[in-house]
Amino acid sequence: GMKSVIFDLDLTLVDTTNLESLRHNRNWQEAYRRISETVMYDGMTEVLEVIRKHHIPCAIVSTSPRPYVEKIVAHYNLPVQHIVSYHDAKPIKPHPAQMLKALDLMGVSAKDAISFGDRVIDIEASNAAGIESVACFWGTKEKGELLHSGYSHAIVKPNEILTLIR
């Protein structure tokens, strides 16, 4: 059957480059105001429509605070049933706790899930949880390190997600 899906949020699902310094400086109120200026990566809308249409269980695992993740999910109407934010499981990525929490919320075992992210910590957390890990190269700021992160798969375009979840 189809895999349950775990996504990182920033630079994986949505290009939030414009919010990076605000997030780094924990200027959350200003970041919230500027979510409308972020952009969905090319091809991601189609991927999310397939996830929605097939009722594929989907979680976001992020090191950002819950209100930030919730606001982006609402802004883009993402087909996400579960959010594991900075506030929801500790220690955060690269520790597996957030990934294990996502599995628990979705009611699936690690072998029935697949995880997508743009950072080494995404790959490390997924691997530590026993989840198939996918390095997403379209938004990453860690290209060199990500190449050597021990991922299960590497992809360069969002539409490649569909071949991996089927």
Outline where the language-model segments fall.
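A short, structured active-site edge motif that brings together acidic residues
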Residues: 79-93
